[in-house]
Design a protein with these regions (language model features):
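Hydrophobic alpha-helical segments characteristic of transmembrane helices
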Residues: 88-138, 144-170
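Hydrophobic alpha-helical membrane-embedded segments
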Residues: 58-80, 151-177, 248-264
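Divalent-cation
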Residues: 1-86
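Juxtamembrane "helix exit" motif at the C-terminal ends of alpha-helical transmembrane segments
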Residues: 80-84, 119-144, 219-243, 252, ...
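Short, charged cytosolic
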Residues: 31-32, 42, 66, 70-101, ...
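Polar-ligand-bearing catalytic/cofactor-coordination segments
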Residues: 2-12, 16, 20-22, 138, ...
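Cytosolic juxtamembrane amphipathic/interface segments immediately preceding
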Residues: 2-10, 15-16, 50-57, 96-112, ...
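Transmembrane alpha-helical segments and their cytosolic interface motifs
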Residues: 107-125, 204-229
Length: 341
């Protein structure tokens, strides 16, 4: 086990289909529990972009880079987890086949690309177009740019909350929210230097200050403040929308710095400011069972220490584990009798 006196490194993660992804300093691990109760693990080295390009690690810039990275990584990990789950894939549509042939790309890459484009369009539609239309309506009534900006910002927050509530009504999404809770509990366990076990992890809350849900809320609030000073007097709805889009990387960059600052501070002011983000997570996390925590623990250990030695593999190359204990750093798989001969 790791040295209990060492300060734990920051590690983040994401809930996926029937599992959890964890991202360590230089690797990503995804653990998925299949219907037969076994767990399969995908492990990839992942060097931060800031190591290759120092400027990407600069304050503000790193936040904008992180936003793009979150979107891309989120889609790719969900796609990987779907494959790892072992469920039958849907037959590609004629359009997907045609597009793959025209672009010279695999159908999987085309489907993922289309999904990413749709996700971006949905986000822009919900959180930029609709609020801009609300602002346009307020301006047409003779309200000031300041009032219109405040109404637009409030609309964004309400849409975000409504979207999360709606998602929580879907049974499969609720289960994913449980894995989200498992991710947070495991991260807390790691941060407190406790042995990673379901029993230890269960004692922690599902609400974590560095969660992406809190980041989204901070983005909304920072954008409201920024747009009170930039572009508030623009009456043309299309131009206001364009200005908001162009400033999105700046908003994301500032929001990232605020999130990190609040998460690592124990001052009374920081606790008060991060409270709304923690409460919003009640919509995107649920209490996990021990099996879900096992998946999160495996991903945590593998992301930090690598795959177990001599782990059996699937045909696709994923490691097969039956217990979270098999992922502990010093664990060595026992040899079978026939292997000893």
């Amino acid at each position: 086990m790791p040295n209990q006196s060492q300060k734990p490194v920051d590690i983040g993660g994401q809930a996926v289909l029937e599992g959890v992804m964890m991202k360590g300093p230089d690797a990503i691990a995804i653990t998925v529990r299949r219907p037969d109760k076994t767990m399969v693990v995908d492990y990839k080295k992942s060097e931060p972009l800031s190591k290759k390009h120092k400027w990407m690690g600069l304050p503000i810039i790193r936040g904008a880079v992180n936003m793009v990275n979150m979107l891309v990584m989120g889609m790719t990990t969900l796609e990987t987890s779907a494959k790892m789950l072992g469920t039958e894939e849907e037959e590609p549509t004629k359009f997907e086949k045609w597009l793959a042939a025209k672009l010279g790309k695999s159908i999987d890459k085309v489907v993922m690309g289309v999904a990413m484009v749709l996700a971006v369009l949905l986000s822009v539609g919900l959180f930029i177009v609709l609020p801009s239309l609300a602002e346009k309506g307020i301006l047409s009534l003779g309200a000031s740019g300041t009032v219109a900006t405040l109404i637009g910002g409030l609309t964004k927050v309400l849409i975000l909350i409504a979207y999360m509530i709606f998602c929580g009504m879907v049974p499969d999404v609720r289960r994913t929210f449980q894995y989200h809770g498992a991710e947070h509990k495991t991260v807390y366990c790691h941060e407190h230097n406790l042995p990673l076990t379901p029993k230890n992890a269960q004692q922690f809350t599902t609400l974590h200050p560095r969660c992406g849900t809190a980041f989204l809320l901070i983005v909304m609030l920072i954008s409201i403040v920024l747009f009170l000073f930039v572009g508030r007097d623009i009456t043309n709805a299309a131009l206001r929308m364009l200005v908001h889009l162009c400033l999105l990387p700046v908003v994301a960059g500032v929001s990232y710095e605020v999130l990190k600052g609040l998460a690592h501070s124990e001052s009374k002011i920081a606790k008060i400011l991060r409270w709304p983000g923690l409460q919003l997570q009640r919509l995107t996390t649920r209490q996990p069972d021990d099996g879900m925590l096992e998946c999160a623990i495996i991903s945590m250990n593998v992301a930090l220490y690598g795959l177990p030695k001599d782990a059996p593999r699937t045909e696709e190359g994923w490691a097969i584990l039956t217990s979270y204990e098999q992922s502990e750093p010093d664990y060595v798989f026992p040899q079978k009798d026939e292997d000893k001969q």
